[in-house]
Amino acid sequence: MAEIRWRGEGSVDGGVREREFEITGGRDTITGVMWSPEGGIPSGSPLVLVGHGGGGNKTAATVLSTGRGLVLEHGIPAVAIDAPGHGERGGVPGRSPEYYALWADAEIMTDHANADWSLVLTSLLETGWFDAERVGWSGYSMGSLIGIPYVATEPRIKVAALGLCGVAGSTPSRSSVGGLLVNRAPLVRCPVIYIIQWNDERFTRDGCLALFDLLGTRDKRLLSFLGAHGEMPEEGRKSGRQFIAERLKA
């Protein structure tokens, strides 16, 4: 299995250690970052994988909020990686021709991203720091376009925070991702909190609600906020973190 190469000891800010790493993947080098308690990672700790949005990267503001929040609020380490074509792996801007080209074939894009995450998760579990039975996923927008197919096929994920996506709207109309989500969502069996923006301009409200209905788990809750796609309040992300932490610590 691929070995994690840590980029030094990282930095500490406000009780949270941020430490970057890289792993040689099947197509290129996977670049990532881990947030953990300053004092160290207790043996058998839970772990949360964090997916970023389209055009973002592993240290985007919303990802930092999730990663640092999990550590500060719940003592749970979190990890994010640059998705294919993003961050150190390409740096495509969101909603650009280059971004939509990545999603021209949604199955290829998600297969590549999911292979990356499976490799990263296996490598992290091999450190002996984490409990393989207490792994969660948090990802909204593109973090759900990638996350739903991943959670559907990765039995090591025990709980997920998803949302800001649906099966219809301007974003899914540009690729085959809507059909892919229709096929994969029924395979999601772990507990899910699903968060939508009521006035999302990229995914229709009906398309978001339809995707929630399609999720195969019987343990799911829906949370919505007024506002556009990029206006999810911190309350929403905090609710996602709380849901994940409660399930991983149960």
PLM regions: where:
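N-terminal cap/lid segment of alpha/beta-hydrolase-fold proteins
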Residues: 1-43
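Conserved alpha/beta-hydrolase
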Residues: 68-92
